[in-house]
Amino acid sequence: MSETGPSLQRPATRAARLSAIEQALATHIITSQSQLSKILIDEGIAVTQATLSRDLDEMHAVKTRLKDGTVAYTVGRSVVASEGEDVGERGEAQMSRVLNGLVTSVAAAGNLVVVHTPSGAAQYVASVIDKQPIEGVLGTIAGDDTVMVICTNDDTAVFRSDWLLSLASK
């Protein structure tokens, strides 16, 4: 998320904590539990080391050696973006594979991007978009055949609309 965008407020629940951990692992290179704890504290989430350890274990987070040799936490097949970096090449390739067969049209409308899919595919497409750290995207809402991508502003929506269309066209 950009520093100019609205900050995400989270309730003090386990689900919100797990979501914050997942978001931190997707947007930062986390090399230790203490580093992750500091990031969570910055987001207003206080957590003990024991709880953090259990959460990471439950999420199947593992330490993985990155291309530059750094050992950092990752979850499953998540694509770790560097600070300030958007979706990486691998993340775009994963998104493109999904979007290519499932997106029938894309249009910007205000700060929203409206993505149409075949019947029954919208929630899957929304999930793929939500799992990537996409600059300027706050989240998605999915119905049966339509996904609304909520962006921080109108210009970002136009940019992300074109970007999603290009991914779907690869």
Curated annotation (Swiss-Prot):
Keywords tagged on the record: Amino-acid biosynthesis, Arginine biosynthesis, Cytoplasm, DNA-binding, Repressor, Transcription, Transcription regulation
MF annotations from Gene Ontology: arginine binding; DNA binding; DNA-binding transcription factor activity
SUPFAM superfamilies per record: C-terminal domain of arginine repressor (SSF55252), Winged helix' DNA-binding domain (SSF46785)
A GO cellular component entry from the record: cytoplasm
Pathway(s) this gene product operates in, as recorded in its UniProt entry: Amino-acid biosynthesis; L-arginine biosynthesis [regulation]
InterPro entries assigned: Arg_repress (IPR001669), Arg_repress_C (IPR020899), Arg_repress_C_sf (IPR036251), Arg_repress_DNA-bd (IPR020900), WH-like_DNA-bd_sf (IPR036388), WH_DNA-bd_sf (IPR036390)
Signal peptide: none
Short name of any one Pfam family annotated for the protein: Arg_repressor
Main subcellular location: cytoplasm
GO biological process: L-arginine biosynthetic process; protein complex oligomerization; regulation of arginine biosynthetic process
Compartments where found: Cytoplasm
Family membership noted in the UniProt record: Belongs to the ArgR family.
Role: Regulates arginine biosynthesis genes.
Xref: PANTHER family: ARGININE REPRESSOR (PTHR34471:SF1)
Name of protein: Arginine repressor
Native source organism of the sequence: Bifidobacterium longum (strain NCC 2705)
